[in-house]
Swiss-Prot record:
Positions in the Cytoplasmic compartment: 156-166, 244-255, 319-337, 392-460
Subunit structure, as described in the record: May form homodimers and heterodimers with GLP1R.
TM region(s), chain numbering: 135-155, 167-185, 223-243, 256-276, 298-318, 338-358, 371-391
Organism field: Mus musculus (Mouse)
Protein name as catalogued: Gastric inhibitory polypeptide receptor
Membrane association type: Multi-pass membrane protein
Residues carrying covalently attached carbohydrate according to the record: 58, 68, 73
GO biological process, one term: cell surface receptor signaling pathway
Gene that produces this protein: Gipr
Gene Ontology molecular function: gastric inhibitory peptide receptor activity; glucagon family peptide binding; signaling receptor activity
Amino acid sequence: MPLRLLLLLLWLWGLQWAETDSEGQTTTGELYQRWEHYGQECQKMLETTEPPSGLACNGSFDMYACWNYTAANTTARVSCPWYLPWFRQVSAGFVFRQCGSDGQWGSWRDHTQCENPEKNGAFQDQTLILERLQIMYTVGYSLSLTTLLLALLILSLFRRLHCTRNYIHMNLFTSFMLRAAAILTRDQLLPPLGPYTGDQAPTPWNQALAACRTAQIMTQYCVGANYTWLLVEGVYLHHLLVIVGRSEKGHFRCYLLLGWGAPALFVIPWVIVRYLRENTQCWERNEVKAIWWIIRTPILITILINFLIFIRILGILVSKLRTRQMRCPDYRLRLARSTLTLVPLLGVHEVVFAPVTEEQVEGSLRFAKLAFEIFLSSFQGFLVSVLYCFINKEVQSEIRQGWRHRRLRLSLQEQRPRPHQELAPRAVPLSSACREAAVGNALPSGMLHVPGDEVLESYC
């Protein structure tokens, strides 16, 4: 659920504190139903109303009040919305909005006559918490976007790092970048929710509805692609460790098809059903839960599969580290480090709250779930880029070698040697930088290489 929508729900929830009728306090569900019913009545009214013949502003429900068609260069006035719990206290009040001379709604809106006479401190505090969470995930996605772009450039520029494993990493980095960019773009296009006063009223977004829905579709695809590439990482690592004796180089096209093609299999049906059955606003509200499960179900399946792969890999890690316990007495520390390293790569943290829906949690648990998911999702790309690029030993070795080669070339240019005496830096074999897993490799000691050890070293 987008954070701006949650801000609206929190606002509606906060309204119930303001008034208690003879039958008791209004529940959150009843309040939301009244607000939803108000919006539906507005849509029906607009459908049955003939637009004026001259230049006029379009009728719309701006998530607060219902506005009829209004002649250009006039100020529209409507009664305070009846869904407000304190409506009896402000029933004589009005909301005002300016229709410009060009037939477009202006940014000015005044509903001071409809404001709650009694401000609620608890609601304001929780609204502040959600606004800070939005700032946090904006910082997280921005940081992830920057570090992922740098990591992608590093893996692309150093040719000796080109192998199937790093190709998959690069596609995963790209999916994280697209997810971050799509979410940040969607936030800018989503309709501002909640009440505003005077000059704080936001610019109407009806004209950008198509762009907003397009951004919503792209966001769902990018999020789905991110989960499928996390699944590709898990499947690839599992194949390297379990299905020994078979090369993975020829499977990369299948991984590409799975990573970028699978999300379209559930996003396209969701778009069609959403357009036919729930074509409202910017598609940010999921009122018909069956439609939302078209997207949610495949994502939950990928999370579950990756969690099972994670458990399987942990079993392999434990068995291999125990066999080398005499040589590696700190195997428990290495196991803990490997476990923590694989968590962001496979998205294992998602399994904590994945089975819990928005309707199943309330109060503090809902905020805890939201904060947990927002923090880890926004900073996950940053963690993956750091763990699998910036502090990766192979990447660091290539950067050092590239720096030494550059210094050597500069030194040779300064010495100005004769053409037949010019020296070239010695190339490093491909296998020394990016090694694919091989079965039966001989170690310097003459012992046979244990299948999977090199893979675990590369990942963990």
